[in-house]
């Protein structure tokens, strides 16, 4: 499948059209960003690692009955995906307290959350992705009640599948974000799942193995990503 025109360039991925109007090429770049894109650096191998990591995770989720946009790997940094009508809201599942939740509520980082929390955020970098709720989504037309219910259902199902996957690999799935879109009217998981959009801690040491290593200037970003990939069985080379 040949990529044609650039359709959209995000903070770490570029989307291209193809000769099939229902399919796109998603290219993972080496860019890494923080502070809503205000801080950007390049890291060798990152695009390749995230592409193969994402393909591996999406395959696992498909096997669990979660519809995804994934079609097939095209290269080390490119994947063929369905063209979705994206819903402009991020779904976040939280199994442990971290990030904005800790700042917002003043609770201890790492606090176990049972049952896991489900949050919604409007995708808007200029507004720093404000937290919203289902009422906002329905009033402003971002998603219908049925779509929201399906997004929530699929997010919790993904959490069940991935929490076990990472737990078996000696890792804690602290939290993660998912984005959904519509394909022929069906709610489908889009975008990506990688250490860029999730928090993963080592079970024994609680070392951070995700993009917090970049956000908090801890170093060893790609080494951590590759270690996580290796533990869960992603073939990188």
Swiss-Prot record:
This protein's GO CC annotations: cytosol
Gene3D superfamilies the UniProt entry points to: ATP-grasp fold, B domain, Phosphorylase Kinase, domain 1
Domain of life: Bacteria
Pathway in which this enzyme or protein is active: Purine metabolism; IMP biosynthesis via de novo pathway; 5-amino-1-(5-phospho-D-ribosyl)imidazole-4-carboxamide from 5-amino-1-(5-phospho-D-ribosyl)imidazole-4-carboxylate: step 1/2
Family matches, as Pfam families: SAICAR_synt
Keywords in alphabetical order: ATP-binding, Ligase, Nucleotide-binding, Purine biosynthesis
Catalytic activity: 5-amino-1-(5-phospho-D-ribosyl)imidazole-4-carboxylate + L-aspartate + ATP = (2S)-2-[5-amino-1-(5-phospho-beta-D-ribosyl)imidazole-4-carboxamido]succinate + ADP + phosphate + 2 H(+)
Residue ranges the record marks as coiled coil: none
InterPro entries xrefs: SAICAR_synt/ADE2_N (IPR028923), SAICAR_synt_PurC (IPR033934), SAICAR_synth (IPR001636), SAICAR_synthetase (IPR050089), SAICAR_synthetase_CS (IPR018236)
PANTHER family reported for this sequence: MULTIFUNCTIONAL PROTEIN ADE2, SI:DKEY-6E2.2
Family per similarity comment: Belongs to the SAICAR synthetase family.
Alphabetical list of HAMAP family matching this protein: SAICAR_synth
Protein name per its UniProtKB record: Phosphoribosylaminoimidazole-succinocarboxamide synthase
Species assigned in the record: Yersinia pestis
High-level lineage: Bacteria, Pseudomonadati, Pseudomonadota, Gammaproteobacteria, Enterobacterales
Gene: purC
């Amino acid at each position: 499948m040949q990529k044609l025109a650039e359709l959209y360039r995000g903070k770490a991925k570029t989307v291209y059209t193809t000769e099939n109007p229902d399919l796109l090429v998603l290219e993972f770049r080496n860019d890494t960003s923080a502070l809503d894109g205000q801080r950007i650096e390049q890291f060798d191998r990152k695009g390749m690692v995230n592409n193969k990591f994402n393909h591996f995770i999406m395959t696992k989720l498909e096997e669990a009955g979660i519809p995804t946009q994934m079609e097939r790997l095209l290269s080390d940094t490119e994947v063929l995906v369905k063209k979705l009508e994206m819903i402009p809201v991020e779904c976040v599942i939280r199994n442990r307290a971290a990030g904005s939740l800790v700042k917002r509520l003043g609770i201890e980082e790492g606090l176990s959350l049972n049952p896991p929390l489900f949050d919604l955020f409007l995708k808007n970098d200029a507004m720093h992705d404000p937290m919203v709720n289902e009422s906002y989504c329905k009033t402003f037309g971002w998603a219908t009640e049925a779509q929201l219910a399906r997004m929530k259902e699929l997010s919790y199902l993904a959490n069940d599948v991935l929490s076990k996957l990472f737990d078996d690999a000696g890792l804690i799935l602290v939290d993660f974000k998912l984005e959904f879109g519509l394909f022929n009217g069906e709610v489908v998981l889009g975008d990506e799942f990688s250490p860029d959009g999730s928090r993963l801690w080592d079970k024994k040491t609680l070392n951070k193995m995700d993009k917090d290593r970049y956000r908090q200037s801890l170093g060893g970003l790609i080494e951590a990503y590759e270690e996580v990939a290796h533990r869960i069985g992603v073939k990188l080379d």
